[in-house]
């Protein structure tokens, strides 16, 4: 059922993800100018380890974390067995690079990235994605982020983005708030080149429908490796232009308070719903690295309601709902009319 990966699969993916960590850190340091990443290497008692890099109190980033890990073990956590029961009973290996950036300026969005690879006996798969969480809405920023990742997916297969975009909307959703964490991006998991592209749990959702409307996956290991490589390389051109455009925008305590309020939603998702956080904690991962995704400051306010017609209201009513960001002309017209396009 499962095609065997190449003999050097672990070393090859490890090197890809280490290189991605290096490139991202270099690009972020260059644009921040003031902040520098501090690296801390760590070893996991059960096998493997990683290197965590954190930048704090830069000119752009209040906190930025870019982590690499390579871990292995004998007993799979329940979060994996429930998704892939055929992997049970095998020793496992997992490697990944993850990143979360929390800028100071509320006009610069928070952003998350994660690319990973997993093996357990004959079972292997790739997963990953990137998603953007603005605090103040600008459609042009959203479009740049989505377009770069769409192009990266289409270098491998024209159908992938049709599934990965709604899958991202589905995954980064706060069920207890009935809202999206941000404006999405791409998300994929359990990709082994067989069966349907969509491997999530919502068979009635948009991602599942998109997957059913196209042919089953016929990608091999090398194709999926290239997908991770292309999408990883798409990150800096998807995000740095937003920083360049927004970093000089002035803001007041009002914008800062709203940013901290919306960061609270980020915390809620990561601690309640995120599978990566759950996997890390279930496998005795390094807690400091796992919780690196949390912002240094956040706030909660009972019964908050944004003023009607304000940028804050546009964010909560439109930019926390799945949209056709690239092609919806009515959305484009609305954003132009309300000065939230560019």
UniProtKB/Swiss-Prot annotation:
GO BP of this protein: chlorophyll biosynthetic process; protoporphyrinogen IX biosynthetic process
Protein's cellular compartments: Cytoplasm
Sequence positions that bind substrate: 98, 114-116
Claim: Cytoplasm is one of the keywords in the record: yes
Site (Important for dimerization): 176
Keyword check for Cytoplasm: yes
Protein name per UniProt: Oxygen-dependent coproporphyrinogen-III oxidase
Species the sequence originates in: Prochlorococcus marinus (strain MIT 9215)
């Amino acid at each position: 059922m499962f095609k065997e990966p190449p003999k050097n699969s672990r070393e090859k993916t490890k090197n890809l993800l280490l290189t991605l960590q290096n490139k991202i850190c270099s690009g972020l340091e260059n644009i921040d100018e003031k902040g520098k990443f501090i690296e801390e290497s760590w070893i996991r008692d059960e096998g493997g380890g990683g290197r965590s890099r954190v930048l704090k109190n830069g000119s752009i980033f209040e906190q930025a974390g870019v982590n690499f890990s390579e871990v292995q073990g004998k007993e799979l956590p329940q979060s994996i067995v429930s998704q892939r029961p055929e992997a049970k009973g095998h020793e496992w290996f997992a490697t990944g690079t993850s990143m979360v950036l929390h800028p100071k300026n509320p006009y610069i969005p928070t952003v998350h990235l994660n690319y990973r690879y997993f093996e357990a006996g004959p079972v292997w798969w790739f997963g990953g994605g990137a998603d953007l969480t603005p605090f103040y809405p600008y459609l042009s920023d959203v479009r740049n982020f989505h377009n770069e990742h769409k192009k990266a997916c289409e270098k491998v297969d024209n159908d992938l983005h049709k599934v990965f975009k709604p899958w991202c909307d589905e995954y980064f959703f706060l069920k207890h708030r009935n809202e999206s964490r941000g404006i999405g991006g791409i998300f994929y998991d359990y990709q082994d080149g067989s069966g349907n592209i969509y491997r999530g749990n919502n068979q009635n959702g948009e991602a599942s429908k998109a997957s059913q409307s196209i042919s089953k996956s016929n990608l091999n290991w090398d194709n999926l490796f290239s997908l991770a490589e292309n999408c990883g390389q798409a990150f800096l051109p998807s995000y740095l232009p937003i920083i360049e455009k927004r970093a000089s925008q002035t803001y007041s305590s009002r914008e800062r308070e709203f940013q901290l309020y919306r960061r609270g939603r980020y915390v809620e998702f990561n601690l309640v719903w995120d599978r990566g956080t759950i996997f890390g904690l279930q496998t005795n991962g390094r807690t400091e690295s796992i919780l690196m995704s949390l912002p240094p400051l956040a706030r909660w306010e009972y019964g908050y309601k944004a003023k009607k017609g304000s940028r804050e209201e546009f964010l909560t009513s439109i930019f926390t709902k799945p949209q056709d960001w690239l092609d919806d002309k009515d959305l484009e017209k609305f954003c132009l009319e309300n000065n939230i396009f560019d």
